[in-house]
């Protein structure tokens, strides 16, 4: 399989999907359902480029839900939460009130790995060396779930990325190891994809048609 040609073709196809918005809405739902009930409080993601699925709206809803649940649990007066209180929470910084954090990658130029910095809507951003927006001077977080973009994906939970190796090098150094979840549209399925020795299988892959891959649970 020519990965360079496959990568180029899939990116071009993704950019020109006539129903990309509908696919994105479906994948948002799949992602939120997959996250339901997970106890994790720090999730790493990415800033979408080249027509990638945008995971940030679903993650912000996840963070917002956790904030409201925390507020409700602290309301020990047994009185209903007033509408104006909910409105106040909505207008305050969810990121500051929430027990949950969202991290976006920042490239470590020395080690060629990724460090995750806290992100929230409206946080200060700057472009990295590749022109991709990244959080500016926010706290470093260590994700226990890591959503990664897939150009393509194949059997066994392996992904086709951009060929830079940043995620594979990062996963080799993160401790504890996070649960890794690929995100991509179903047109990226590559049935004949063959992983290389340095490729690391993901724990799950989600697409607009549902859970495309889920690693068996270990005893």
Where are these regions (language model features)?
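Surface-exposed, charge/polar-rich loops and edge strands
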Residues: 1-5, 12, 137, 141-146, ...
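N-terminal active-site beta-alpha-beta segment that forms phosphate/nucleotide-binding
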Residues: 1-141
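Receiver (REC) domain switch-region micro-motif
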Residues: 43, 146-147
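Short, structured patches in soluble enzyme cores that scaffold and shape functional sites
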Residues: 47, 106, 118, 134, ...
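Short glycine-rich anion-binding loops that position phosphate/pyrophosphate groups of nucleotides
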Residues: 48-51, 151-155
